[in-house]
């Protein structure tokens, strides 16, 4: 996955947009940054917030995060966004998976913090630690394969930094460890049902 290739390169900063608002803010922040910054944009979010149903893709019209000021603004590199607030489980996602995770949280009925990472390198470990101290549980969601990915490093860091706060192991919902199959794309991608199942599993551990 491109995110793994770039995040494993020392010296690069990597940001990942999930909405029109943070896409503009992160891009301007990247332009103004003195360091090299890779800006990743999920094509799945070009038309609207993708909630995991390929037959029902809404547009950005009337979505609060689609209101993009014409004036200059930036989204700080290295700072996460709290997309949903809860108290039972922390769900961490980035890019298009933020919206799929939102749908999954609604489906699960579990009160969850949803952290939109926004910045992969550096990532906002303080926001993650604060959330896990509150919830005691964590689910990571990304569309890249599971093995040897950026999410693996993040899960390891969370286990190290939040060990005494965690009441269950960090759970991950990812793409499969296969070449990306365009003809069966929707079977490959993490779905709301898979994420909701992982949230329930984490709550039971």
Model-identified regions with their sequence ranges:
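Conserved thiamine diphosphate
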Residues: 1-33, 175, 198, 203
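Thiamine diphosphate
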Residues: 43-44, 48-205
């Amino acid at each position: 996955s491109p995110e793994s290739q770039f995040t494993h390169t020392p010296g690069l900063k990597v940001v990942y947009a999930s909405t029109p608002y943070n896409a503009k803010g992160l891009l301007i922040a990247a332009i103004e940054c003195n360091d090299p910054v890779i800006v990743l944009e999920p094509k799945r979010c070009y038309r609207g917030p993708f909630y995991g149903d390929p037959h029902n893709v809404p547009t950005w019209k009337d979505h609060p995060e689609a209101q993009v000021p014409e004036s200059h603004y930036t989204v700080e590199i290295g700072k996460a966004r709290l997309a949903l607030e809860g108290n039972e489980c922390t769900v961490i996602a980035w890019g298009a998976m933020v919206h799929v995770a939102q749908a999954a949280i609604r489906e699960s009925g579990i009160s969850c913090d949803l952290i939109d990472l926004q910045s992969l390198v550096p990532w906002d470990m303080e926001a993650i630690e604060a959330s896990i101290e509150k919830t005691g549980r964590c689910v990571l969601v990304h569309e890249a394969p599971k093995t040897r990915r950026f999410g693996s490093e993040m899960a390891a860091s969370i286990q190290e930094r939040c060990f005494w706060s965690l009441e269950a192991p960090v759970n991950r919902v990812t793409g499969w460890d296969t070449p990306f199959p365009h003809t069966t794309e929707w079977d490959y991608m993490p779905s709301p049902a898979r994420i909701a199942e992982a949230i329930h599993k984490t709550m039971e551990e």
